[in-house]
Amino acid sequence: CGELGLPVSIHVADPQAFWKPYDATNERWRELKNHPHWWFGDPAKYPPFAELLAALDRVITRHPETTFVCVHFANNAEDLDWVEQALDRHPNMLADLAARIPELGRHDPARVRRLFVKHQDRILFATDFQVYERLTLGSGGDGPPPTDEDALAFFDKEWRWLETNDRQFEHMTPIQGDWRIDGIGLPADVLRKIYFDNARRLLVRSWPLPVLRAIRVDKDFKPDGRLKESVWAQATPARLEYRLRDGIARPALATTARA
């Protein structure tokens, strides 16, 4: 991937609570009860949390020419010092926010803001928003599937946390823990990088500029009635060709999509 200039999205470990006792004392008990296979506290089956993070650090160190996007805020949103020190050590490391704003929002907002401003070029907006047979907004249980209105409320809380200094409001995935979060009120120039510029910088190295538009890959999802399906159906399939840094295309890695 370093040779191709392709970033690697890497998921190592999970919330620290998934290694804590599997009982009602666990702050994520509601989530773990719904997803018992997410519990990794049995040392006979799973490595310790710290061992997984150490392995991640070794991989990033071993491949300095590869850009690693460490999802879920490097899966250590509970420990801002660890993430900050890792970003300091590794210029080829980025962290995304997927499903970790509830954890990040528990910290002192001034501390989080300082970290985000310091590493404003290395943090990516992300949600863990998934569309399979039902919406998944970061996490979920066995209740009714989320609605489009739930999705709007989910994003509103994401924006609120990043853009305002509001205090002690409910976070977007209460199944992940019963606490409130504090907004970090980032400056507009930092928000633009986190929302857009940092991702564009990663993707432009990999995709030809003419097709950097919204795309729908045919097998990705079924329209929910709000999309103009007739427009998508008439769109001409386009090839997204991955290229080496010297501009040489790699046709074997191309993806066909409607653009």
Residue ranges and their predicted role:
Residues 1-82:
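Divalent metal-binding pocket/active-site signature
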Residues 12-14, 99, 129, 227:
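A mature extracytoplasmic/lumenal domain signature
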Residues 20, 105, 135, 224, ...:
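Short acidic, gly/pro-rich beta-turn/loop elements at beta-sheet edges
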Residues 50-58, 67-208:
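H/E-rich (His + Asp/Glu) clusters that bind or coordinate divalent metals
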Residues 208-259:
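Structural preference for beta-rich elements and adjacent junctions enriched in aromatics
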